[in-house]
Design a protein with these regions (language model features):
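Alpha-helical substrate-binding/gating segment
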Residues: 170-176, 186-207, 215
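N-terminal Rossmann NAD(P)H-binding glycine-rich loop of SDR-like oxidoreductase domains
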Residues: 8-30
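Catalytic helix-loop patch of NAD(P)-dependent Rossmann-fold dehydrogenases
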Residues: 92, 126-162
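Conserved catalytic Lys-bearing alpha helix of Rossmann-like short-chain dehydrogenase/reductases
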Residues: 95-101, 110, 146-154, 192
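Conserved C-terminal active-site "lid" loop/helix of NAD(P)H-dependent oxidoreductases
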Residues: 208-210, 217-234, 238, 245-275
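Conserved Rossmann-fold NAD(P)-dependent oxidoreductase catalytic core, especially the SDR/UDP-sugar
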Residues: 100-138
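NAD(P)H-binding glycine-rich loop region in Rossmannoid oxidoreductase-like domains
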Residues: 44, 50, 55-93
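NAD(P)-cofactor binding segment of oxidoreductase domains
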Residues: 73, 85-113
Length: 278
């Protein structure tokens, strides 16, 4: 394009009927000649450039059909939270589904794959200091572990197969933060839309990990300045404007939720010894 941004022939957005997908749809207008919207549920209200596809990406053949003619992917589909700690359900949707998506993308010659990862990939790092993108994974639970797998698979596809891969460790995606922890980990709808579009339109890159958070002055995570610059992500919102409403909403001092970055997700079902976690 004349302004230097990338333009794609067909962009695939999975999980398009979900909370994040519904926000991204209007933000992605004009980034591709056609935008394919995939979800388990029907996708309504199609714009002229949009096309819909319904199906379960963990079922045989669905990922391949979704990838037909696609050159850029935003993969949001999957179970978006701990799902009651059901590892089998999370494995099927988030591990098997993501594996099939990367395999289908590779076979179809997809150039760029943007993967919705999570801050819960690093949840069992002790709270009190920011966690960078190069530190080892310490997932909060089965959901976080599934996202670690997705990031690892993305790294493999970038290094071995030359696919451009961006992993977005999305924080608390809400209209406004709901507790004190989210004063550092919140991402606004506006900033999430900007981040996705920047990743789609950016010039060539290899492999990036970016924390999907707003410009929160109480930032919990960091080390991604170069990756943000590579795509041009400059968040505009700051959770601090909500601080007086929610900074008192916090777990008891010394609790598992207070001691680790993953908060309540780390605490749910916890039966270990927190003093042994360094």
């Amino acid at each position: 394009m004349a302004d230097g941004t990338r333009h794609w022939q067909r962009l695939l957005l999975t999980g398009a009927a979900g909370e994040i997908g519904s926000v991204l749809r209007p933000a992605l207008a004009g980034t591709a000649t056609a935008i394919r919207l995939q979800d388990l549920r029907p996708v309504a209200g199609l714009a002229p450039q949009e096309e819909a596809m319904q199906g379960d990406l963990a079922e045989p053949g669905i990922a391949e059909a979704a990838m037909a003619g696609v050159d850029c992917v935003i993969h949001l589909a999957g179970i978006p939270r701990e799902a009651g700690g059901d590892p089998d359900a999370i494995f099927r949707a988030n591990v098997l589904g993501t594996h099939l998506m990367f395999s289908a993308a590779r076979a179809a010659g997809v150039k760029r794959f943007i993967f919705a990862s999570s801050n819960h990939t690093i949840g069992f790092h002790p709270a009190g200091r920011p966690v960078g993108t190069e530190e080892r994974p310490r997932p909060s639970g089965f959901y976080g572990a599934s996202k670690v797998y997705g990031e690892t698979l993305g790294r493999l596809h970038a290094d071995k197969f030359g696919m451009e891969v961006a992993c977005l460790r999305i924080g608390a995606f809400r209209t406004k933060p709901g507790n004190a922890r989210e004063l550092g980990g919140w991402i606004s709808h506006r900033d999430m839309a900007q981040l996705a579009r920047r990743c789609v339109e950016a010039s060539d890159f290899h492999f990036l990990v970016i924390y999907g958070v707003s410009a929160n002055r109480r930032a919990l995570w960091g080390g991604d300045a170069a990756a943000r610059a590579a795509v041009g992500y400059v968040p505009e919102d700051d959770a601090e404007v909500f601080a007086t409403e929610i900074e008192g909403i916090a777990p008891p001092p010394g609790s598992v939720a207070a001691r680790f970055h993953g908060g309540g997700v780390c605490e749910a079902g916890f039966s270990g010894d927190p003093d042994r976690i360094r």
